[in-house]
């Protein structure tokens, strides 16, 4: 509900609300494809949940295809039906969110290899 903010300038709105306003502005053009760059960037947990709701609603209710770049894998898994994981310009995996998130190449790129973890443990001991 944005009624309380209707007379404020966009710049004076809280960051999370500004992101929703930006999303609404983009939807005014009635696009068939919506490109989102890090839609959860700078948002707190509650605002990220709201963003997930809006993205799902855009897809389901308006039938708009959403293509986004996002590092928050939790958000990705909730709103995406297809995921492409990349690292330094190289495609690591493509498919359903769970398939991609559990792909060994993706896990290694985000968390490091088992050898890296073992080496860090030895150094810490």
PLM region descriptions:
Residues 1-125:
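Glycine-rich phosphate-binding loops of nucleotide-dependent enzymes
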């Amino acid at each position: 509900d944005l009624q309380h903010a209707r007379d404020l300038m966009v710049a004076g709105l809280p960051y999370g609300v500004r992101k929703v306003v930006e999303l609404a502005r983009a939807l005014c053009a009635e696009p068939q494809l919506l490109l989102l760059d890090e839609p959860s960037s700078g948002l707190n947990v509650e605002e990220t949940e709201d963003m997930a709701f809006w993205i799902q609603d855009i897809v389901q209710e308006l039938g708009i295809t959403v293509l986004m770049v996002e590092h928050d894998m939790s958000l990705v898994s909730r709103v995406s039906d297809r995921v492409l994981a990349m690292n330094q310009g190289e495609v690591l995996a493509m498919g359903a969110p769970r398939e991609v998130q559990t792909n060994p190449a993706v896990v290694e790129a985000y968390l490091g290899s088992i050898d890296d973890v073992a080496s860090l443990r030895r150094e810490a001991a």
